[in-house]
Design a protein with these regions (language model features):
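N-terminal intrinsically disordered/low-complexity leader segments
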Residues: 1-19, 89, 196-203
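Hydrophobic alpha-helical connector segments
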Residues: 69, 83-114, 157, 161, ...
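Hydrophobic alpha-helical segments that form the core
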Residues: 4, 100, 107-110, 153-192
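Helix-turn-helix
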Residues: 19, 23, 27-65, 69
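Amphipathic alpha-helical segments used for helix-helix packing
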Residues: 103, 107-133, 163, 170-171
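Short, basic, alpha-helical segments at the C-terminal edge of helix-turn-helix-like DNA-binding modules
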Residues: 72-78
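Amphipathic alpha-helical packing segments from all-alpha helical-bundle domains
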Residues: 79, 83, 103, 110, ...
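Pre-recognition alpha-helix immediately N-terminal to the DNA-recognition helix
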Residues: 23-31, 77, 103, 107
């Protein structure tokens, strides 16, 4: 009989815990965006979330953990956007890897514009200690995913387009300029492997 009583109590407790965690992340995002990571304090976050310091440390190890969780959640959404765009392109019969890449890149930039304040937060250079290592690792994994679209001998092409898109992300997020995003994608879409470019020039 006790399990019949305990199960709904446990469920309610779990729901409250999830709601508190969500509120803390929402508050952390707002505080970090408005004050920056360095100037933000745990008390700012719990005050905005109307939660206790104890509840924050129940869910997170501290301010840096909040920041990194926000980053990982944003990147997960971005990965979902780009994967869906690539799948849709292939489902429509697109076989040119560069065109598939551009579709995915557009989805990534659209996500940055839709959540511009959050995207800008991670480009400020104001993250927790060691965040630059996290960003470098993320860029490396991004390049690996891009490489999967192309032939094995097109490594140089992958380096160029990944670097170009990374630079475009920073500028598009800074300006909020959707036309700039489209112009950059149009230019990147014209880039071809060295062998192809040489052949075109000789032709």
């Amino acid at each position: 009989m006790s399990s019949d009583v305990e199960q709904p109590v446990t469920a309610r407790t779990s729901e409250r815990g999830a709601a508190t965690r969500t509120a803390l992340l929402k508050a952390a995002k707002e505080v970090f965006v408005s004050k920056g990571f360095a100037e933000a304090g745990v008390t700012d976050v719990v005050g905005r979330a109307e939660a206790s310091v104890g509840s924050l440390y129940h869910h997170f190890s501290g301010k840096a953990d909040l920041y990194l969780t926000l980053f990982e959640e944003f990147q997960a959404k971005q990965a979902q956007r780009t994967s869906q765009a690539a799948r849709e392109a292939r489902a429509e019969g697109e076989s040119d890897p560069m065109k598939v890449f551009i579709r995915a890149a557009r989805a990534y930039l659209d996500g940055c514009l839709e959540e511009r304040e959050v995207a800008a937060l991670f480009l400020r250079g104001d993250g927790p200690p060691g965040f630059e290592v996290v960003m470098r690792d993320r860029l490396r994994k991004w390049a690996e995913r891009n490489a999967a679209l192309f032939d094995d001998d097109e490594g140089a092409l992958v380096v160029v387009i990944t670097g170009a898109l990374a630079a475009a992300v920073s500028e598009v997020v800074r300006t909020g300029d959707r036309d700039l995003a489209e112009d950059v994608l149009a230019i990147i879409g014209q880039i071809r492997p060295a062998a192809s470019a040489t052949g075109a020039a000789n032709g």
